[in-house]
C-alpha cells in the first residue's frame, strides 16, 4: 500500500446456509450490497470465492473510514452472510525475498 494513511482489510463473508441462494440474493438486492460496493473510502483489491464458504474480499481502506466499512457490512451484508474482518497485508513480496534468501 503506497500511502500510510490506508490499511488493508480482509473481509470474510460466510453464506448463511439456512437460506437458499435465491433468498440470499433477494436480501442483497434489497439492501443494495452489490450496487453500493465497495464502501465509501475503500478500494477493492481482490474478491474471490472460497467454495462452500463464501467470499474473501481484500479492501484498501482510508484509516479514518474503517468504521464506515464496518457499518456498511452491518447494514447490507448481515442477513445474507456471517461477517468477519481482519487487518492484513500483502505477504507476496516478503515471501519472494525469503525464497531468495533460502535458495
Residue ranges of model-derived segments:
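Conserved short beta-strand edge segments in small beta-sheet-based binding/regulatory domains
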Residues: 77-90
Amino acid at each position: 500500500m503506497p500511502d500510510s494513511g490506508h490499511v488493508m482489510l480482509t473481509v470474510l463473508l460466510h453464506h448463511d446456509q439456512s437460506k437458499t441462494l435465491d433468498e440470499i440474493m433477494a436480501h442483497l438486492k434489497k439492501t443494495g450490497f452489490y450496487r453500493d460496493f465497495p464502501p465509501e473510502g475503500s478500494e477493492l483489491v481482490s474478491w474471490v470465492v472460497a467454495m462452500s464458504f463464501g467470499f474473501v474480499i481484500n479492501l484498501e481502506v482510508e484509516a479514518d473510514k474503517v468504521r464506515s466499512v464496518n457499518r456498511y457490512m452491518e447494514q447490507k451484508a448481515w442477513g445474507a452472510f456471517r461477517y468477519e474482518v481482519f487487518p492484513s497485508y500483502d505477504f507476496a513480496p516478503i515471501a519472494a525475498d525469503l525464497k531468495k534468501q533460502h535458495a
